[in-house]
Amino acid sequence: MVRVAVVDRDYCKPSKCNLECIRFCPVNRSRKKKAVDLAEDKSRAVIFEDVCIGCGICVKKCPFSAISIVNLPDELEKVLVHRYGENMFKLYNLPTPKTGSILGIIGRNGSGKSTSIKILSGQLKPNLGRYSNPPEWDEVIRSFRGTELQTYLSKLANNEIKAVVKPQYIELARKALKGTVRDMLKKADERGVYSDLVKALNIERILDRSISELSGGELQKFLIAAVLSKNTNAYFFDEPCSYLDVRERLRVARSIVEFANPARNYVVVVEHDLMILDYISDYVVIMYGEPGVYGVSSKPYSTRVGINHYLKGYLPAENMLIREEEVKFKISARGESAGKQEFPILAWSNIEYTYPSSKFRLIVPPGRVHSGEVIGVLGPNGIGKTTFIKLLSGELKPVSGDILIKPERVVIKPQEVSPSIMSEETVLANLKKASQLVVDPTSWLYVELVKRMRINRLLERNISDLSGGELQKVAIAVTLAQEADVYFLDEPSAYLDVEERIAVARVIRRIVEERRKTAIVVEHDLMLQAFVSDKIMVFWGEPAVEGVASSPLDPREGLNLLLKNLDVTVRRDPESGRPRINKPGSVLDREQRQRGLYYIVD
């Protein structure tokens, strides 16, 4: 067995602890050669993997949960691709891009997806685990002899592959790029496709705006357009659907297929929205392992089979269990039974609201929401979804109509999360302020919100030090920990990987069912909405001008209405029950359109 010891440099704080990892280590106490010691600069602990016996005492004793130790099969070391440094993340295997098809990559955050993209795009040279004495390209290529990666890496080393990457974190572009969208895109255009891309991605309205003024979704589309403008033979897209609504996600997916030209080029997409990844990819690889500790790239699977294996939590080609629970989508059963013999928490008549400043108008027909229900809200950005919740909470007053049953308390998780939305300095203090029960390890609320969402190792961290995904999970936990009649969660899946999205969906359902309250969830990931929602409200209209909503509908009716507006047909996978987008013009697409069924449940 190979022992992998990782010390998280962000968590390890020797100056703030009693060095429990060193003091309690049985090897340190019984042998001359230490297994754990302080680094020379005393900034962190160092674990010597060849001496460590893997007892796990340091893992349990560390007050900051900074240490991880795992044992891996010896065979994995033969396919070690990269290690960042001493007691740092290890990557095994690499996804294999192929011309003629689009490669999709699925996996948890911290499992090596972005590292793989950096290597495949030439930003990072693999060191085969020898971080202190990195090998030359010839040795790296020899280690992949007999595989398709040998050819790819040979081209990469000889500069025959010119790669361009759409990064995962797009906020940095706002600070780095100066000028208008029009000027930047014309400057980036190496293929003469400027006009076609502007039309395909629907960005005409933002051409004269400065990069610094763009919203998250607008910035995302600008960067995708800039990447597709480049005359290269390898395109990499790291989470291209973040910040985008359903219509824009489909628009981006179609643009990537059309302009990246996968028939001649290498195209790789990392995406957590499995419905979009299924639509765009020809085959997938699954990144699994222990986040932040090690990651392994699976063998390639066809898209449908690979995603289903991922949802099952078992990879047959590797004989590897990657999750204990299987994810199944059973939409119709819950949708039909929801709300029976329950009391109403919300009710409203036909209401209308107009903003005095912008003249934006929202029209909502009568509706009623019962205890124990999760209401999914779907529709474009800027169409009135947040205005609707402000009307329900009493923050805004309708111009006509009335809220017939008003909730006593509404708690809101906003769309954009930042440290400024938290009132306390640390994660623990914010959770404790929301509810004393949520920080009690013996309570069900702690199990659901802290353990299930893996916030327990973040408790002592400062809010300002959290990543986007960590802050998102803390914001969700703080919202759901509070006592309220209605929980409003605006895009809770942003920054989260597939595993975390599933965990959040289960937590929302559990809290709502246990407390007999209501949750209203605005979410653009249709698969997540299908998983979590009892009823669905659909918003449509013209952004910033007029929004029209439906009443809360059965999931089948709601999704059918949304997809009809999007002009897309969707079927359910017979094995997993997950929604899958039909290819335009396919037999199923034509049959469903003829029947008027844009979403088929059975």
Each model region followed by its residue ranges:
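ABC ATPase nucleotide-binding domain signature region
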Residues: 98-108, 114-190, 273-283, 287-304, ...
